[in-house]
A protein has these predicted regions:
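STAS-like cytosolic regulatory interaction modules
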Residues: 1-57, 68-117
Length: 117
């Protein structure tokens, strides 16, 4: 059984990475790879959205992957929005002091609206 499923889609120039399950040191590679691939799906994405609504556990490795994606997006001038409606994702980000560093929203619709031109 897979502990993490990660999908990747594009709509209106926004690359969306959707994760469901547990992000830990054994599964983080899949999330990191999809976040990195998100930039190549469209010539210049308006935004990359990491939808972690279905994530039940976010370990330090997952936080590090989000920071790396944030840095990569910043270098390319593309905002990264993190959808984190649940405590399993928000709490690690809060403890690490990243709520003001990352663009964290409670629902995907908010990220989609903010990514509009």
């Amino acid at each position: 059984m897979r502990l993490l499923h990660v999908g990747l889609s594009v709509g209106s120039g926004v690359a969306v990475v959707t994760a469901t399950g547990e992000v830990d040191m054994t599964t983080v590679g899949l999330l990191a790879e999809r976040l990195d691939r998100a930039h190549g799906l469209v010539p210049v994405p308006r935004a990359v959205v990491a939808d972690l609504s279905g994530v039940r556990f976010l370990a330090a490795a997952g936080v590090a992957a989000l920071l790396a994606a944030h840095r990569t997006c910043g270098e390319r001038g593309v905002p990264l929005w993190v959808v984190a409606p649940n405590r399993a994702v928000r709490h690690p980000l809060e403890v690490c002091g990243l709520m003001s560093v990352l663009h964290v929203v409670a629902e995907a619709a908010t990220a989609d609206t903010l990514a509009e031109p």
